[in-house]
Protein backbone atom coordinates (compact mmCIF):
# COMPACT_ATOMS: atom_id res chain seq x y z
CA UNK A 1 0.00 0.00 0.00
CA UNK A 2 1.30 3.47 -0.91
CA UNK A 3 1.83 6.02 1.84
CA UNK A 4 -0.91 8.49 2.71
CA UNK A 5 -1.16 11.55 0.49
CA UNK A 6 -2.83 13.71 3.15
CA UNK A 7 -0.88 15.38 5.97
CA UNK A 8 -2.10 14.89 9.53
CA UNK A 9 -2.62 17.83 11.90
CA UNK A 10 -1.40 17.70 15.49
CA UNK A 11 -4.83 18.67 16.90
CA UNK A 12 -7.08 15.78 17.95
CA UNK A 13 -10.33 15.26 19.85
CA UNK A 14 -10.49 12.45 22.40
CA UNK A 15 -13.49 11.02 24.28
CA UNK A 16 -14.28 13.06 27.38
CA UNK A 17 -16.12 11.08 30.09
CA UNK A 18 -17.13 14.36 31.73
CA UNK A 19 -19.56 15.06 28.89
CA UNK A 20 -22.72 13.72 30.54
CA UNK A 21 -26.47 14.03 30.19
CA UNK A 22 -29.26 12.99 32.58
CA UNK A 23 -31.53 10.10 31.67
CA UNK A 24 -34.59 8.64 33.33
CA UNK A 25 -33.71 5.71 35.60
CA UNK A 26 -36.46 3.28 36.65
CA UNK A 27 -35.17 0.57 39.05
CA UNK A 28 -36.13 -2.91 37.93
CA UNK A 29 -36.93 -2.11 34.30
CA UNK A 30 -33.41 -2.79 33.04
CA UNK A 31 -33.31 -6.33 34.48
CA UNK A 32 -33.77 -9.57 32.55
CA UNK A 33 -37.17 -10.00 34.22
CA UNK A 34 -38.92 -6.64 34.11
CA UNK A 35 -40.61 -5.77 37.39
CA UNK A 36 -40.72 -2.11 38.29
CA UNK A 37 -39.72 -1.16 41.82
CA UNK A 38 -40.94 2.40 41.42
CA UNK A 39 -43.77 2.35 43.96
CA UNK A 40 -41.60 0.86 46.72
CA UNK A 41 -38.85 3.42 46.09
CA UNK A 42 -41.28 6.35 46.20
CA UNK A 43 -42.75 5.02 49.44
CA UNK A 44 -39.27 4.85 50.99
CA UNK A 45 -38.49 8.43 49.96
CA UNK A 46 -41.85 9.59 51.33
CA UNK A 47 -41.02 8.12 54.74
CA UNK A 48 -37.87 10.23 55.09
CA UNK A 49 -38.11 13.09 57.53
CA UNK A 50 -38.17 16.70 56.31
CA UNK A 51 -34.65 17.37 57.57
CA UNK A 52 -33.18 14.27 55.91
CA UNK A 53 -35.05 15.01 52.67
CA UNK A 54 -33.71 18.56 52.56
CA UNK A 55 -30.16 17.45 53.35
CA UNK A 56 -30.16 14.77 50.65
CA UNK A 57 -31.51 17.18 48.04
CA UNK A 58 -28.97 19.90 48.90
CA UNK A 59 -26.17 17.35 48.72
CA UNK A 60 -27.39 16.16 45.31
CA UNK A 61 -27.47 19.71 43.95
CA UNK A 62 -24.00 20.35 45.34
CA UNK A 63 -22.62 17.24 43.62
CA UNK A 64 -24.35 17.55 40.26
CA UNK A 65 -25.67 21.09 39.82
CA UNK A 66 -22.67 22.47 37.94
CA UNK A 67 -22.62 19.52 35.52
CA UNK A 68 -26.13 20.03 34.10
CA UNK A 69 -28.53 22.67 32.84
CA UNK A 70 -31.68 23.12 34.94
CA UNK A 71 -31.18 20.16 37.25
CA UNK A 72 -34.31 21.05 39.22
CA UNK A 73 -36.40 21.11 36.04
CA UNK A 74 -35.12 17.66 35.09
CA UNK A 75 -35.97 16.28 38.53
CA UNK A 76 -39.47 17.78 38.27
CA UNK A 77 -39.93 16.16 34.87
CA UNK A 78 -38.77 12.73 36.05
CA UNK A 79 -41.05 12.96 39.09
CA UNK A 80 -43.99 13.72 36.79
CA UNK A 81 -43.19 10.58 34.78
CA UNK A 82 -43.55 8.33 37.84
CA UNK A 83 -45.96 10.27 40.07
CA UNK A 84 -48.79 7.85 39.25
CA UNK A 85 -46.86 5.26 41.29
CA UNK A 86 -47.07 7.35 44.45
CA UNK A 87 -49.65 6.14 46.96
CA UNK A 88 -50.51 9.72 48.03
CA UNK A 89 -48.83 12.07 45.57
CA UNK A 90 -50.66 15.09 46.98
CA UNK A 91 -49.09 14.46 50.38
CA UNK A 92 -45.53 14.78 49.03
CA UNK A 93 -43.89 18.12 49.70
CA UNK A 94 -42.19 20.02 46.83
CA UNK A 95 -38.83 19.02 48.29
CA UNK A 96 -39.84 15.35 48.43
CA UNK A 97 -41.01 15.47 44.83
CA UNK A 98 -37.66 16.86 43.71
CA UNK A 99 -35.85 14.16 45.65
CA UNK A 100 -38.04 11.46 44.07
CA UNK A 101 -37.04 12.89 40.69
CA UNK A 102 -33.38 12.65 41.69
CA UNK A 103 -33.76 8.97 42.62
CA UNK A 104 -35.27 8.35 39.19
CA UNK A 105 -32.37 9.99 37.36
CA UNK A 106 -28.85 8.97 36.39
CA UNK A 107 -25.92 10.39 34.46
CA UNK A 108 -24.93 8.99 31.08
CA UNK A 109 -21.50 9.72 29.57
CA UNK A 110 -22.33 10.19 25.89
CA UNK A 111 -18.82 9.52 24.52
CA UNK A 112 -17.18 7.41 27.20
CA UNK A 113 -16.84 4.39 24.88
CA UNK A 114 -15.88 6.01 21.58
CA UNK A 115 -15.68 9.23 19.58
CA UNK A 116 -15.49 8.84 15.82
CA UNK A 117 -16.79 9.32 12.27
CA UNK A 118 -16.90 13.13 11.95
CA UNK A 119 -18.13 15.36 9.15
CA UNK A 120 -17.34 19.05 8.57
CA UNK A 121 -19.45 21.93 7.22
CA UNK A 122 -19.23 25.71 7.35
CA UNK A 123 -20.58 26.99 10.69
CA UNK A 124 -23.68 29.24 10.62
CA UNK A 125 -21.72 31.91 12.55
CA UNK A 126 -18.87 33.48 10.56
CA UNK A 127 -18.44 36.61 12.69
CA UNK A 128 -15.23 37.82 14.37
CA UNK A 129 -12.85 35.98 12.05
CA UNK A 130 -9.58 37.07 10.52
CA UNK A 131 -8.52 37.03 6.89
CA UNK A 132 -8.43 33.52 5.45
CA UNK A 133 -10.30 31.96 8.38
CA UNK A 134 -13.45 29.84 8.26
CA UNK A 135 -15.42 28.66 11.26
CA UNK A 136 -16.61 25.08 10.83
CA UNK A 137 -19.08 22.79 12.57
CA UNK A 138 -17.81 19.25 13.10
CA UNK A 139 -20.41 16.55 13.67
CA UNK A 140 -19.32 13.62 15.84
CA UNK A 141 -20.55 10.12 16.48
CA UNK A 142 -20.52 9.71 20.25
CA UNK A 143 -20.77 6.22 21.76
CA UNK A 144 -21.58 5.61 25.40
CA UNK A 145 -22.58 2.81 27.77
CA UNK A 146 -24.39 -0.02 26.01
CA UNK A 147 -22.91 1.08 22.67
CA UNK A 148 -25.64 3.68 22.17
CA UNK A 149 -24.64 6.32 19.63
CA UNK A 150 -25.73 9.94 19.54
CA UNK A 151 -24.79 12.93 17.41
CA UNK A 152 -22.62 15.61 18.95
CA UNK A 153 -20.72 18.62 17.67
CA UNK A 154 -17.49 20.55 17.95
CA UNK A 155 -16.57 23.98 16.62
CA UNK A 156 -13.26 24.81 14.98
CA UNK A 157 -11.60 27.55 12.93
CA UNK A 158 -9.51 26.60 9.90
CA UNK A 159 -7.11 28.84 8.01
CA UNK A 160 -5.31 30.75 6.94
CA UNK A 161 -3.36 27.98 5.27
CA UNK A 162 -3.32 24.80 7.32
CA UNK A 163 -3.90 26.41 10.70
CA UNK A 164 -6.53 24.72 12.89
CA UNK A 165 -7.99 25.72 16.25
CA UNK A 166 -10.67 23.62 17.96
CA UNK A 167 -12.89 25.44 20.45
CA UNK A 168 -13.18 24.23 24.03
CA UNK A 169 -15.99 21.67 24.46
CA UNK A 170 -16.67 22.16 28.17
CA UNK A 171 -19.99 23.11 29.71
CA UNK A 172 -23.26 21.33 30.49
CA UNK A 173 -24.82 19.39 27.63
CA UNK A 174 -28.39 19.69 26.35
CA UNK A 175 -30.39 16.98 24.60
CA UNK A 176 -33.00 19.35 23.21
CA UNK A 177 -36.77 19.23 23.46
CA UNK A 178 -39.30 17.70 21.11
CA UNK A 179 -41.18 20.49 19.35
CA UNK A 180 -44.14 20.58 17.03
CA UNK A 181 -43.55 19.66 13.42
CA UNK A 182 -45.60 20.04 10.26
CA UNK A 183 -45.84 16.52 8.90
CA UNK A 184 -45.82 15.98 5.14
CA UNK A 185 -48.54 13.83 3.66
CA UNK A 186 -46.30 12.74 0.77
CA UNK A 187 -43.76 11.30 3.22
CA UNK A 188 -46.50 9.36 4.99
CA UNK A 189 -47.64 8.01 1.60
CA UNK A 190 -44.07 6.93 0.79
CA UNK A 191 -43.68 5.25 4.17
CA UNK A 192 -46.90 3.28 3.86
CA UNK A 193 -45.95 2.21 0.34
CA UNK A 194 -42.60 0.98 1.67
CA UNK A 195 -44.47 -1.24 4.14
CA UNK A 196 -47.06 -2.40 1.58
CA UNK A 197 -49.83 -0.84 3.64
CA UNK A 198 -52.62 -0.22 1.12
CA UNK A 199 -56.12 -0.82 2.44
CA UNK A 200 -59.30 1.18 2.95
CA UNK A 201 -58.36 2.38 6.44
CA UNK A 202 -55.05 3.82 5.22
CA UNK A 203 -56.65 5.25 2.07
CA UNK A 204 -59.38 6.97 4.09
CA UNK A 205 -56.82 8.57 6.41
CA UNK A 206 -54.63 9.76 3.55
CA UNK A 207 -57.64 11.21 1.75
CA UNK A 208 -58.61 13.24 4.83
CA UNK A 209 -55.15 14.65 5.57
CA UNK A 210 -53.96 17.95 4.06
CA UNK A 211 -50.53 18.18 2.42
CA UNK A 212 -49.12 19.58 5.69
CA UNK A 213 -50.60 18.64 9.04
CA UNK A 214 -49.80 18.66 12.74
CA UNK A 215 -50.14 15.92 15.35
CA UNK A 216 -53.56 17.09 16.50
CA UNK A 217 -54.95 16.97 12.97
CA UNK A 218 -53.55 13.47 12.47
CA UNK A 219 -55.14 12.15 15.66
CA UNK A 220 -58.45 13.87 14.84
CA UNK A 221 -58.55 12.14 11.46
CA UNK A 222 -57.89 8.77 13.12
CA UNK A 223 -60.59 9.42 15.73
CA UNK A 224 -63.15 10.20 13.02
CA UNK A 225 -62.65 6.95 11.12
CA UNK A 226 -65.99 5.19 10.49
CA UNK A 227 -66.62 2.25 12.86
CA UNK A 228 -67.32 -0.01 9.88
CA UNK A 229 -63.70 0.42 8.76
CA UNK A 230 -62.20 0.01 12.22
CA UNK A 231 -64.12 -3.22 12.79
CA UNK A 232 -62.41 -4.87 9.82
CA UNK A 233 -59.71 -7.42 10.61
CA UNK A 234 -57.00 -5.03 9.41
CA UNK A 235 -58.36 -1.99 11.24
CA UNK A 236 -56.41 -1.90 14.49
CA UNK A 237 -53.21 -3.12 12.86
CA UNK A 238 -53.42 -0.38 10.25
CA UNK A 239 -53.96 2.26 12.94
CA UNK A 240 -50.81 1.07 14.70
CA UNK A 241 -48.89 1.13 11.42
CA UNK A 242 -50.11 4.64 10.60
CA UNK A 243 -49.02 5.95 14.00
CA UNK A 244 -45.64 4.20 13.79
CA UNK A 245 -44.95 5.54 10.30
CA UNK A 246 -46.06 9.05 11.21
CA UNK A 247 -43.92 9.05 14.38
CA UNK A 248 -40.79 8.59 12.28
CA UNK A 249 -40.92 12.31 11.50
CA UNK A 250 -40.22 14.66 14.39
CA UNK A 251 -38.38 17.82 15.36
CA UNK A 252 -36.13 18.75 18.26
CA UNK A 253 -34.81 22.16 19.28
CA UNK A 254 -32.20 23.50 21.67
CA UNK A 255 -32.24 26.63 23.85
CA UNK A 256 -30.80 29.70 22.14
CA UNK A 257 -28.18 30.10 24.87
CA UNK A 258 -26.55 26.72 24.18
CA UNK A 259 -23.33 26.61 22.19
CA UNK A 260 -23.13 24.14 19.32
CA UNK A 261 -20.73 21.84 21.21
CA UNK A 262 -23.27 21.54 24.05
CA UNK A 263 -26.02 20.14 21.82
CA UNK A 264 -26.62 16.39 21.67
CA UNK A 265 -29.02 14.80 19.22
CA UNK A 266 -30.24 11.89 21.30
CA UNK A 267 -32.40 8.94 20.06
CA UNK A 268 -36.05 9.97 20.20
CA UNK A 269 -38.01 7.20 18.44
CA UNK A 270 -38.14 3.40 18.78
CA UNK A 271 -36.28 3.01 15.47
CA UNK A 272 -33.37 4.99 16.99
CA UNK A 273 -33.47 3.43 20.45
CA UNK A 274 -29.99 1.90 20.14
CA UNK A 275 -28.37 4.76 18.34
CA UNK A 276 -28.09 7.53 15.75
CA UNK A 277 -24.95 6.66 13.80
CA UNK A 278 -22.57 8.24 11.29
CA UNK A 279 -24.23 11.55 10.45
CA UNK A 280 -23.09 12.91 7.08
CA UNK A 281 -23.73 16.68 7.09
CA UNK A 282 -23.71 18.90 4.03
CA UNK A 283 -24.60 22.53 3.38
CA UNK A 284 -27.26 22.26 0.69
CA UNK A 285 -28.02 25.26 -1.52
CA UNK A 286 -30.96 25.83 -3.86
CA UNK A 287 -33.12 28.76 -4.99
CA UNK A 288 -34.54 29.18 -1.48
CA UNK A 289 -31.07 29.58 0.05
CA UNK A 290 -28.68 27.44 2.10
CA UNK A 291 -29.78 24.81 4.60
CA UNK A 292 -27.98 22.05 6.49
CA UNK A 293 -28.93 18.51 5.55
CA UNK A 294 -27.63 15.21 6.81
CA UNK A 295 -28.29 11.51 6.71
CA UNK A 296 -27.73 9.11 9.59
CA UNK A 297 -28.35 5.48 10.46
CA UNK A 298 -31.06 4.71 13.00
CA UNK A 299 -30.53 1.46 14.92
CA UNK A 300 -33.07 -0.23 17.19
CA UNK A 301 -30.86 -3.10 18.35
CA UNK A 302 -31.95 -5.45 15.56
CA UNK A 303 -32.29 -3.55 12.31
CA UNK A 304 -31.10 -0.33 10.71
CA UNK A 305 -32.96 2.40 8.86
CA UNK A 306 -31.72 5.48 7.06
CA UNK A 307 -32.92 8.85 8.28
CA UNK A 308 -32.54 12.41 6.98
CA UNK A 309 -32.41 15.63 8.95
CA UNK A 310 -32.62 19.27 7.96
CA UNK A 311 -31.75 22.43 9.89
CA UNK A 312 -31.43 26.08 8.99
CA UNK A 313 -29.29 26.98 12.00
CA UNK A 314 -28.04 23.76 13.69
CA UNK A 315 -30.34 24.62 16.61
CA UNK A 316 -33.66 23.23 15.37
CA UNK A 317 -33.58 19.90 13.57
CA UNK A 318 -36.31 18.05 11.67
CA UNK A 319 -35.91 14.30 11.16
CA UNK A 320 -37.65 12.16 8.54
CA UNK A 321 -37.26 8.58 7.26
CA UNK A 322 -35.68 7.95 3.85
CA UNK A 323 -37.52 5.52 1.60
CA UNK A 324 -36.86 3.45 -1.49
CA UNK A 325 -34.37 0.84 -2.74
CA UNK A 326 -31.54 3.38 -2.81
CA UNK A 327 -31.92 4.00 0.94
CA UNK A 328 -31.81 0.43 2.24
CA UNK A 329 -28.31 0.39 3.64
CA UNK A 330 -25.95 2.56 5.63
CA UNK A 331 -23.87 5.43 4.37
CA UNK A 332 -26.01 7.64 2.14
CA UNK A 333 -24.40 10.99 1.26
CA UNK A 334 -26.43 13.82 -0.27
CA UNK A 335 -25.16 16.08 -3.04
CA UNK A 336 -24.86 19.76 -1.96
CA UNK A 337 -27.21 20.94 -4.73
CA UNK A 338 -29.46 19.54 -7.40
CA UNK A 339 -27.82 18.39 -10.63
CA UNK A 340 -29.91 18.82 -13.75
CA UNK A 341 -32.94 19.37 -11.52
CA UNK A 342 -32.39 16.06 -9.73
CA UNK A 343 -31.76 15.41 -6.04
CA UNK A 344 -28.88 12.92 -5.97
CA UNK A 345 -27.09 10.88 -3.33
CA UNK A 346 -24.28 8.37 -3.06
CA UNK A 347 -25.24 5.05 -1.52
CA UNK A 348 -24.14 1.44 -1.05
CA UNK A 349 -27.34 -0.53 -1.42
CA UNK A 350 -25.55 -3.84 -2.12
CA UNK A 351 -23.17 -3.54 0.83
CA UNK A 352 -19.95 -3.33 -1.18
CA UNK A 353 -20.28 -0.95 -4.16
CA UNK A 354 -20.69 2.83 -4.34
CA UNK A 355 -23.82 3.73 -6.30
CA UNK A 356 -25.71 6.85 -7.39
CA UNK A 357 -29.38 7.15 -6.49
CA UNK A 358 -32.01 9.72 -7.49
CA UNK A 359 -35.02 10.96 -5.53
CA UNK A 360 -38.20 10.36 -7.53
CA UNK A 361 -41.47 12.30 -7.51
CA UNK A 362 -42.87 9.96 -4.83
CA UNK A 363 -40.04 10.80 -2.39
CA UNK A 364 -38.40 7.42 -2.86
CA UNK A 365 -34.72 6.95 -3.62
CA UNK A 366 -34.52 4.88 -6.78
CA UNK A 367 -32.45 1.76 -7.36
CA UNK A 368 -28.85 2.98 -7.67
CA UNK A 369 -26.63 2.97 -10.72
CA UNK A 370 -23.18 1.52 -9.88
CA UNK A 371 -20.30 4.01 -9.74
CA UNK A 372 -17.31 2.30 -8.18
CA UNK A 373 -16.65 -1.31 -7.18
CA UNK A 374 -13.72 -2.72 -5.16
CA UNK A 375 -10.66 -2.81 -7.38
CA UNK A 376 -7.47 -1.71 -5.64
CA UNK A 377 -5.76 -4.05 -3.18
CA UNK A 378 -6.60 -1.82 -0.20
CA UNK A 379 -10.36 -1.91 -0.93
CA UNK A 380 -11.09 -5.43 -2.14
CA UNK A 381 -13.57 -6.30 0.63
CA UNK A 382 -15.90 -3.34 0.10
CA UNK A 383 -16.02 0.36 -0.70
CA UNK A 384 -18.26 3.20 0.43
CA UNK A 385 -18.34 6.96 0.54
CA UNK A 386 -16.78 9.22 3.16
CA UNK A 387 -19.35 11.98 2.92
CA UNK A 388 -21.09 14.23 0.43
CA UNK A 389 -19.47 15.02 -2.92
CA UNK A 390 -17.52 18.30 -2.99
CA UNK A 391 -17.96 20.52 -6.02
CA UNK A 392 -14.75 21.60 -7.77
CA UNK A 393 -14.07 23.04 -11.22
CA UNK A 394 -12.71 19.65 -12.26
CA UNK A 395 -15.78 17.70 -11.12
CA UNK A 396 -17.41 16.24 -8.03
CA UNK A 397 -14.71 15.17 -5.58
CA UNK A 398 -15.83 12.08 -3.67
CA UNK A 399 -13.91 10.70 -0.71
CA UNK A 400 -14.25 6.94 -0.38
CA UNK A 401 -13.37 4.31 2.16
CA UNK A 402 -12.08 0.88 1.30
CA UNK A 403 -11.58 -2.23 3.41
CA UNK A 404 -8.52 -4.41 2.88
CA UNK A 405 -6.67 -7.26 4.60
CA UNK A 406 -7.32 -7.63 8.34
CA UNK A 407 -10.38 -5.35 7.93
CA UNK A 408 -8.11 -2.33 7.57
CA UNK A 409 -10.02 0.81 6.56
CA UNK A 410 -8.37 3.49 4.41
CA UNK A 411 -9.65 6.60 2.64
CA UNK A 412 -9.42 7.12 -1.12
CA UNK A 413 -10.94 9.46 -3.70
CA UNK A 414 -12.93 9.58 -6.95
CA UNK A 415 -13.79 12.38 -9.35
CA UNK A 416 -17.23 12.44 -10.99
CA UNK A 417 -18.30 14.41 -14.04
CA UNK A 418 -19.77 17.74 -12.91
CA UNK A 419 -22.80 17.55 -15.19
CA UNK A 420 -23.13 13.76 -15.47
CA UNK A 421 -22.14 12.47 -12.02
CA UNK A 422 -23.04 8.93 -13.02
CA UNK A 423 -19.73 8.96 -14.90
CA UNK A 424 -16.42 8.50 -13.02
CA UNK A 425 -13.77 10.80 -14.52
CA UNK A 426 -10.76 9.77 -12.42
CA UNK A 427 -9.76 7.92 -9.29
CA UNK A 428 -6.89 7.88 -6.81
CA UNK A 429 -5.08 4.54 -7.21
CA UNK A 430 -3.40 4.80 -3.83
CA UNK A 431 -4.75 5.96 -0.49
CA UNK A 432 -5.45 9.48 0.64
CA UNK A 433 -5.22 8.44 4.29
CA UNK A 434 -4.50 5.09 5.96
CA UNK A 435 -4.04 4.07 9.62
CA UNK A 436 -0.51 4.70 10.89
CA UNK A 437 1.03 3.54 14.15
CA UNK A 438 -0.78 6.29 16.05
CA UNK A 439 -4.17 5.53 14.48
CA UNK A 440 -4.32 1.75 14.47
CA UNK A 441 -5.16 1.02 18.13
CA UNK A 442 -8.58 1.63 19.59
CA UNK A 443 -12.09 0.33 20.22
CA UNK A 444 -12.28 -0.69 16.53
CA UNK A 445 -8.63 -1.07 15.47
CA UNK A 446 -7.04 -0.37 12.08
CA UNK A 447 -9.63 2.15 10.92
CA UNK A 448 -9.61 5.68 9.55
CA UNK A 449 -13.07 6.87 8.53
CA UNK A 450 -14.72 10.17 7.67
CA UNK A 451 -18.33 11.21 7.14
CA UNK A 452 -17.58 14.40 5.25
CA UNK A 453 -14.80 16.82 4.31
CA UNK A 454 -14.63 20.45 3.20
CA UNK A 455 -12.56 22.58 0.81
CA UNK A 456 -11.33 25.99 1.98
CA UNK A 457 -8.90 28.17 0.01
CA UNK A 458 -7.74 25.27 -2.13
CA UNK A 459 -7.12 22.92 0.82
CA UNK A 460 -9.16 19.78 1.43
CA UNK A 461 -9.81 19.39 5.16
CA UNK A 462 -10.60 15.82 6.19
CA UNK A 463 -11.81 15.16 9.75
CA UNK A 464 -11.50 11.46 10.47
CA UNK A 465 -12.12 8.92 13.18
CA UNK A 466 -9.07 6.90 14.18
CA UNK A 467 -10.06 3.41 15.34
CA UNK A 468 -12.99 4.92 17.28
CA UNK A 469 -10.45 6.17 19.82
CA UNK A 470 -10.16 9.80 18.73
CA UNK A 471 -10.90 12.26 15.94
CA UNK A 472 -8.05 13.66 13.89
CA UNK A 473 -7.72 16.13 11.03
CA UNK A 474 -5.76 15.85 7.80
CA UNK A 475 -5.22 18.20 4.86
CA UNK A 476 -4.13 17.99 1.25
CA UNK A 477 -4.12 20.63 -1.46
CA UNK A 478 -6.85 20.06 -4.01
CA UNK A 479 -4.49 20.52 -7.01
CA UNK A 480 -2.09 17.93 -5.54
CA UNK A 481 -4.92 15.47 -5.02
CA UNK A 482 -6.32 15.94 -8.52
CA UNK A 483 -2.88 15.58 -10.10
CA UNK A 484 -2.37 12.27 -8.26
CA UNK A 485 -5.52 10.80 -9.79
CA UNK A 486 -5.54 8.68 -12.91
CA UNK A 487 -8.11 8.98 -15.63
CA UNK A 488 -10.88 6.42 -15.54
CA UNK A 489 -11.36 4.33 -18.68
CA UNK A 490 -14.25 5.35 -20.90
CA UNK A 491 -17.26 3.01 -20.83
CA UNK A 492 -16.36 1.68 -24.28
CA UNK A 493 -12.76 1.03 -23.26
CA UNK A 494 -13.85 -0.69 -20.07
CA UNK A 495 -16.17 -2.96 -22.04
CA UNK A 496 -13.38 -3.92 -24.43
CA UNK A 497 -11.00 -4.68 -21.54
CA UNK A 498 -13.59 -6.99 -19.96
CA UNK A 499 -13.94 -8.87 -23.22
CA UNK A 500 -17.42 -7.53 -23.91
CA UNK A 501 -19.52 -7.91 -27.01
CA UNK A 502 -17.88 -7.12 -30.32
Region spans (language model):
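Beta-rich carbohydrate-recognition and catalytic domains
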Residues: 1-274, 282-332, 337-381, 391-443, ...
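Donor nucleotide-activated moiety binding/catalytic core segment of transferases
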Residues: 378-386, 446-449
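A conserved acidic, glycine/proline-rich C-terminal tail/linker
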Residues: 439-453
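Electrostatic interaction modules used in gene-expression and signaling proteins
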Residues: 453-455, 463
Amino acid sequence: MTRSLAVRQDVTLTPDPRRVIIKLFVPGEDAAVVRTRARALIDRVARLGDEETGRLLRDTFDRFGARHRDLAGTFHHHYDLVRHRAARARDLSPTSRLLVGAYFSHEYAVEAAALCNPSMVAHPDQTELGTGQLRVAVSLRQVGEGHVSSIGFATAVIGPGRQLTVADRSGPLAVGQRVGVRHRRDLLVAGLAEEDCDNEVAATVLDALPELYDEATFERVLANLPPDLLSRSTGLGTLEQLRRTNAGSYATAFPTDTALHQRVLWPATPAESNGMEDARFVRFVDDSGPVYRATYTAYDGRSIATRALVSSDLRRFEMTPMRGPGARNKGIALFPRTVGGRHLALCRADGETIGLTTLDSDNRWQAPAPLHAPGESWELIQVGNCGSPIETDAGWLVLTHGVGPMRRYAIGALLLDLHRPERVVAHLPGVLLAPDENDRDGYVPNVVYSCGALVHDGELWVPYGASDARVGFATVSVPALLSAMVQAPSPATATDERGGAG
